[in-house]
């Protein structure tokens, strides 16, 4: 990217989203918006989009990308667990079952706003209490929607993913890259 271009402002505190965008070669400036993520009475997919929009609108800049990921178990949102016990409960509920992961993004360019929601279906394998205790003990799931990270130790919990794996991680990278590229914002 030419030196005269502004950076891509990531309206997210997610180290995973930042790392994904940096892996593509984009210079990133993180601006964590002060947006409350709890309490919106919306269905899971609509909630992901509303939160991404709120985050994006809360940050100034020419090129702004915000995203939010929501884990949807039979229409119920499983957010970030409050503590290890709630993480344990989430994993027990997900064990041996499929669920949906909705990742929404809000991309503001100098000329337009693009908003999309991408969904993947995740299948957990049946988990023993010992496996759940091992994963909860790692602490990895405490800052992640649904209480697990598919790209880290949580990969051991998954049977398979239908759809884009990066949607589960927190950003449909290929789609975001294509949108930025088509608008002349290149690494």
Swiss-Prot record:
Cofactor(s) this protein cannot do without: a divalent metal cation
Reaction it catalyzes: dTTP + H2O = dTMP + diphosphate + H(+); UTP + H2O = UMP + diphosphate + H(+)
GO cellular component: cytoplasm
Active site: residue positions: 68
Domain of life: Bacteria
A Gene Ontology BP annotation from the UniProt entry: nucleotide metabolic process
Enzyme class: hydrolase
Subcellular location per the Swiss-Prot or TrEMBL entry: Cytoplasm
A Pfam family the protein falls into: Maf
Alphabetical UniProt keywords: Cytoplasm, Hydrolase, Nucleotide metabolism
Record carries keyword Hydrolase: yes
The EC number(s) this enzyme carries: 3.6.1.9
GO MF annotation: an example: dTTP diphosphatase activity
UniProt site positions, description: Important for substrate specificity: 16, 69, 151
UniProt record similarity statement: Belongs to the Maf family. YhdE subfamily.
PANTHER family found in the cross-reference section: BIFUNCTIONAL DTTP/UTP PYROPHOSPHATASE/METHYLTRANSFERASE PROTEIN-RELATED, BIFUNCTIONAL DTTP_UTP PYROPHOSPHATASE_METHYLTRANSFERASE PROTEIN-RELATED
Described purpose of this protein according to its UniProt entry: Nucleoside triphosphate pyrophosphatase that hydrolyzes dTTP and UTP. May have a dual role in cell division arrest and in preventing the incorporation of modified nucleotides into cellular nucleic acids.
Protein name: dTTP/UTP pyrophosphatase
Organism: Thermus thermophilus (strain ATCC BAA-163 / DSM 7039 / HB27)
